[in-house]
């Protein structure tokens, strides 16, 4: 009898532990879901860590080929808010798959979007205005989606995120976190401006053209190796190298998710070191600061 009582107590304890692990505080549901890591940083700074934030695209994955799992779709359905750039293919598909359309917020609203991913043959200053609904076209449809790589665009995105969060959490006051974030983005803007004004050259070579908004903001020239997702021909590589030498380029940037074969060839012929960057890292302020240093100092 005593043995049976002990067994029942043990079963009850294990059951309680299992229930806690599955649905208790140990694994809280994410209240806000974001599409990519840099957006999580914005939300966490605004809410000062008071809200659980989940990210769809895992570290090291490419948003261009990403497709959410059924489990992630369940998390999206259970979240209060879904914040996206509004410019990547899978984000557009999400809008068609979720039940509550009002929970999905496009943070590109108000951003002056760049037409196309500029290659080495295109001027970085040509751009056009687009309405918010047009933001759902992915980059291969003619819109550069990398709006989180420039302080000036980040400020617009932060404002959009704050307004959406304030609307969905009317009893909470996140103004202090928002203002603190905006102050840091203003400081980052000033840092970038000063660094590029003091630089010997305003041109840089990059494998995948992810810095078009940064280039536009500070009068830089982005010379891209890849064009429309395709590796360049030998003739195009020669043109890139000639253009880079003519403009005194000191650095070649590449992202970890792209092949290094072409990067190494171009870097060797240019006589510069290839430097790895990660525009999708969680902290966009530190990421932009490091990219600015690499471009302006060439090392």
Regions found by a protein language model. Give the residues of each.
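Extracytoplasmic metal-acquisition and chelation regions
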Residues: 18-299
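Bacterial N-terminal signal peptides
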Residues: 9-20
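Bacterial N-terminal signal peptides that target proteins for export
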Residues: 1-9
């Amino acid at each position: 009898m005593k043995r049976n009582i002990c067994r029942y107590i043990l079963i009850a304890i294990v059951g309680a532990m299992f229930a806690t692990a599955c649905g208790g505080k140990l694994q809280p549901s994410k209240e806000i879901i974001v599409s990519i890591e840099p957006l999580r940083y914005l939300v966490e700074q605004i809410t000062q860590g008071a809200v659980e934030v989940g990210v769809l695209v895992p570290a090291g994955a490419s948003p261009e080929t990403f497709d959410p799992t059924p489990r992630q779709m369940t998390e999206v359905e259970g979240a209060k808010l879904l914040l996206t750039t509004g410019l990547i293919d899978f984000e557009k598909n999400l809008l068609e798959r979720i039940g509550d359309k009002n929970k999905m917020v496009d943070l590109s609203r108000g951003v002056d979007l760049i037409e196309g991913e500029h290659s080495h043959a295109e001027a970085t200053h040509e751009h056009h205005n687009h309405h918010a609904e047009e933001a759902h076209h992915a980059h291969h449809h003619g819109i550069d989606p990398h709006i989180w790589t420039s302080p000036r665009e980040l400020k617009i995105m932060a404002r959009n995120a704050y307004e959406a969060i304030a609307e969905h959490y009317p009893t909470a006051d996140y103004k202090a976190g928002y203002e603190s974030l905006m102050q840091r983005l203003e400081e980052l803007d000033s840092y970038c401006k000063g660094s590029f004004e003091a630089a010997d050259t305003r041109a840089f070579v990059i494998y995948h053209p992810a810095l078009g908004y940064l280039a536009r903001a500070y009068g830089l020239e982005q010379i891209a190796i890849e064009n429309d997702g395709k590796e360049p021909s030998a003739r195009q590589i020669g043109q890139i190298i000639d253009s880079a030498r003519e403009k005194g380029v000191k650095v070649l940037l590449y992202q970890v998710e792209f092949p290094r074969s072409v990067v190494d060839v171009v870097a060797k012929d240019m006589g510069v070191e290839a430097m790895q960057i990660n525009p999708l890292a969680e902290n966009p302020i530190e990421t932009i600061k490091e990219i600015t240093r690499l471009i302006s100092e060439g090392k």
